[in-house]
Amino acid sequence: MMRGCHICKLPGRVMGIRVLRFSLVVILVLLLVAGALTNLLPNIKEDKMLTLRREIKSPSKSALDSFTLIMQTYNRTDLLLRLLNHYQAVPSLHKVIVVWNNVGEKGPEELWNSLGPHPIPVIFKPQTANKMRNRLQVFPEVETNAVLMVDDDTLISAQDLVFAFSIWQQFPDQIIGFVPRKHVSTSSGIYSYGGFELQTPGPGNGDQYSMVLIGASFFNSKYLELFQKQPAAVHALIDETQNCDDIAMNFLVTRHTGKPSGIFVKPINMVNLEKETNGYSGMWHRAEHFLQRSYCINKLVNIYDGMPLKYSNIMISQFGFPYANHKSKM
């Protein structure tokens, strides 16, 4: 009887073992599925990290392949809007910074934005004082290595800008621009400022220049920081004359590099639009303008204890362009 009873309980025990095995299989399958899902999580995180890396790297790539336009303006809203519209179509332009020198007056930011959208962001920077050197601040919005600085009455063709930017990429430590000037030492040892109408400064054929004006030029954004570190007397001179910040920048660059401060690029189509505005006339119309420029050169020589500017006769022009069509009116 005892054996019979023992034998009768065997089927139940077998069923229990089967249930246990089934449960173990289910648990094992669940563990495998959970493990597989867990293994997928690092891939998701890795994808996110790759995306994040791309986002982090993209500004550096943009910094090399694009430039920021800085334009200082005063009493020329009509021209400003026209120029902003023109420069929106320039390739490689990353951002536009408008240095608004009409102190206490509201800029045309709302009007500009209301007529958008625009392909290139424009940032208006109202100033608390109308100073010439406002445009040489270290703007936190500048995210590119190259800065294009353009006066608010100057229209430069997209073709000229694309070409000049390509030259700057080859010579990123110099000013690459469209308007050359030079200094000349007189017999008395006093320096004069001028253009190609002055005597040739050295032996040999052809003419030379020693400065490239920054109002139509590309230069490295690091020079904005270096400008802030120049002697206080330099800043005071610019504020005193409301002039000569471009001459000071040429002194800075050539002192920093030991090379000529800039390279002259011959423009194909660059136009001064000052006659088309109802606003402010440029400083170069003032009778004392060139006298001030000569004054600044001599003052800077005293501040820096010497003349650092170097002459150059290099002019770069676009190969193969039909020069009969040149329209430069500068």
Swiss-Prot record:
Q: What is the effect of changing residue 246 to A?
A: Abolishes enzyme activity
Asked if the keyword Kinase belongs to this entry, the reply reads no
Where does the chain cross the membrane? Answer: 22-42
Which residues form each disulfide bond in the chain? 244-296
UniProt: UDP-N-acetyl-alpha-D-glucosamine binding residues:
72, 76, 101, 130, 135, 151-153, 245-246, 293
User: Which InterPro entries does UniProt cross-reference here?
Assistant: Glycosyltrans_GT2/GT47, GT64_dom, Nucleotide-diphossugar_trans
Question: Which family, according to UniProt?
Answer: Belongs to the glycosyltransferase 47 family.
| Name used for this protein in its record | Exostosin-like 2
